[in-house]
């Protein structure tokens, strides 16, 4: 069933850009991994939109982040407002329309698909099981061989041969 649902994404390869973050909690500490992930996804989505708008100046687009309802709704909306007004560590996110829109995933097939992408990413990074994840790799935002839509937050002292780190030549610190 999961494989069939993810195949729907793969069938629309040219029209879909995925964004995901895998966080090693120990490497992120003392930062909140949810907030760190949210900032990275916002930044990467904003950069994708900026790149797209530069390539297509007559078809400028803004992005809306739609998320599953959770206990993190209020804090993440506050962070999104802060990023638009004062910026994040990456600057202001000028290509996002407003704060994230939170919906019950039971009411949205797109959010259910996003949940499956998150699950596949979690299985890959937590259990080294790429059964679902590997078919998604070509769907992550990518330019010039670098996967921008997938970020792995980890200790730079550890070797890593995941798609995200290899595409940036970040197997080891200094490498």
What positions do the PLM features span?
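Phosphate-ester processing/binding pockets and catalytic centers
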Residues: 1-175
